[in-house]
Design a protein with these regions (language model features):
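Conserved small/polar residues in nucleotide/adenosyl-binding loops
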Residues: 156-163
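A short, Trp-centered hydrophobic/proline-enriched beta-strand micro-motif
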Residues: 124-132
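Amphipathic, small/basic residue-rich leader segments at the start of a protein or domain
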Residues: 1-96, 112-123
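A structural signal for short hydrophobic beta-strand segments in well-ordered beta-sheet cores
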Residues: 146-149
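Short, solvent-exposed loop/turn elements at beta->coil junctions and helix N-caps
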Residues: 66, 133-137
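N-terminal glycine-rich flavin-associated loop
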Residues: 93-112, 138
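Active-site-adjacent elements of ketosynthase-type condensing enzymes
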Residues: 136-144
Length: 163
């Protein structure tokens, strides 16, 4: 048995033992787990599933183990996703922190920032969001506008020279 076949067998066995039955059903809108300090779990098995996946590092399988991720390579992640799909498992955590913030902290944060924030994000203990605010538009990104002025071989967009 190859390493990947062995990994698939281990994942399948772990999921069979640890994924609660109600987490193998289609997602119910009010049961989506966003995490955070004041998270409410309408389905108690959602919290169990989050805790188990968080302990395993599989809420963010590609992130390094030392920060609470799974430390998996791309082939292992494909297998994990395939096995999750096979049993119809719901995502344990929907988190902008995982998708948007954790990769930035991994890339640009210092060690203290990584250790402080990433494990809490991956376990759903804290919740992050991203806000946009633009002059004349506020947070309505659909109303953004810009203009450009042809300067010969250069093209300047509005406010670009001020940066």
């Amino acid at each position: 048995m190859s390493n990947l076949e062995n990994f698939r067998a281990q994942v399948s066995e772990w999921l069979e033992e640890n994924c609660p039955p109600s987490m193998r059903t289609p997602m119910v809108e009010d049961e989506v787990v966003w995490g955070g300090r004041n998270a409410v779990y309408k389905n108690p098995e959602s919290k169990i599933w989050l805790d188990k996946m968080g302990e395993k590092g599989w809420t963010a399988p590609a992130l390094p183990k030392e920060y609470g991720g799974g430390g998996l390579n791309s082939d292992e992640i494909k297998i994990l996703n395939s096995e999750l799909f096979k049993i119809g498992a719901r995502p344990a955590l929907n988190s902008f922190g995982i998708w948007m913030l954790a990769p930035v902290i991994i890339e640009y944060g210092n060690e203290a920032q990584k250790m402080e924030h990433i494990p809490k994000i991956l376990k759903g203990e804290i919740r992050w969001c991203q806000g946009y605010s633009e002059p004349g538009s506020g947070s309505d990104l659909a109303s953004l506008s810009t203009k450009a002025e042809d300067m010969g071989c250069l093209l300047y967009t509005s406010d670009a020279a001020d940066e």
